[in-house]
Amino acid sequence: MTVGSLPAPLVKPSAPRPLLPILVAAIALALPCSITAADDALAPQRADMVREIAAVAAAAAAQSGRHAIDPRVMAVMGQVPRHEFVPDAQKPHAYENRPLPIGHGQTISQPYIVALMTDLMMVKPGDTVLEIGTGSGYQAAVLTGLARAVYTIEIIEPLGRHACDRLKRLAYRQVACKVGDGYYGWDEHAPYDAIVVTAAASHVPPPLIRQLKPGGRMVIPVGAQFLTQYLLLVEKSEDGTVSTRQILPVRFVPLVGKH
């Protein structure tokens, strides 16, 4: 959950371009059916958000190494109702490309960062994904449009309980959630094809490396609060060798727990 990821480059979004219609339709069929009239009314705002994500991704390519976000990820970002995952007072800002407070000192991440982290995981339709830091449930909802199953852990009990209820209400049935210390992962369902951590750790947790499948990818912010943090891509090769690569500087809330 970002508290203000690397300031978005000051770019003017390019002229609207249609998202791949067939791909968007396919993603829509895969997502829950509880789309309301309000969701439909906000579709233009989601489309604007997606265009801004694309513009920021292009402007940040020199740092991130990603010149464009996978169209599958962009299609899902254009379908998931972000306004359902923020407090009422923040709903007017739901489709702005910035983090928003969700209570308990936590935030919902900037849409560009959600898209980038999801893109870096390279999630495939049959994959099982672990998320550390459920927050309001938005990242988990995005992942359900791409993966077979999503497991998500939140250490702050009220946030975790409300996020789980919200995901159930919105019919995201591929998600299993629990309250716990995400540092230790969720061994019962391991190994995972991809892992995403939405809070900054001082180091990459060894339990998460163990639970990552050979050939899998983990995206995690690492660094101390109020100091430099970097978004890391952790890859485990088929022979178990682990490599890491810095993607870009970010600013996340800290990963808390008894570790």
From Swiss-Prot:
Protein's UniProt keywords contain Acyltransferase: no
Physiological role: Catalyzes the methyl esterification of L-isoaspartyl residues in peptides and proteins that result from spontaneous decomposition of normal L-aspartyl and L-asparaginyl residues. It plays a role in the repair and/or degradation of damaged proteins.
Keywords noted in UniProt: Cytoplasm, Methyltransferase, S-adenosyl-L-methionine, Transferase
Family: Belongs to the methyltransferase superfamily. L-isoaspartyl/D-aspartyl protein methyltransferase family.
Species of origin: Cupriavidus necator (strain ATCC 17699 / DSM 428 / KCTC 22496 / NCIMB 10442 / H16 / Stanier 337) (Ralstonia eutropha)
UniProt xrefs under SUPFAM superfamilies: S-adenosyl-L-methionine-dependent methyltransferases
UniProt protein name: Protein-L-isoaspartate O-methyltransferase 1
Gene: pcm1
Biological processes per GO annotation: methylation; protein modification process; protein repair
InterPro entries reported for this sequence: PCMT (IPR000682), SAM-dependent_MTases_sf (IPR029063)
GO CC annotation: cytoplasm
EC number(s) recorded for this UniProt protein: 2.1.1.77
PANTHER family: PROTEIN-L-ISOASPARTATE O-METHYLTRANSFERASE, PROTEIN-L-ISOASPARTATE(D-ASPARTATE) O-METHYLTRANSFERASE
Location of this chain's protein in the cell: Cytoplasm
Alphabetical list of PROSITE patterns matching this protein: PCMT (PS01279)
Catalytic reactions of this protein: [protein]-L-isoaspartate + S-adenosyl-L-methionine = [protein]-L-isoaspartate alpha-methyl ester + S-adenosyl-L-homocysteine
GO molecular function, one term: protein-L-isoaspartate (D-aspartate) O-methyltransferase activity
Catalytic residues in the record: S109
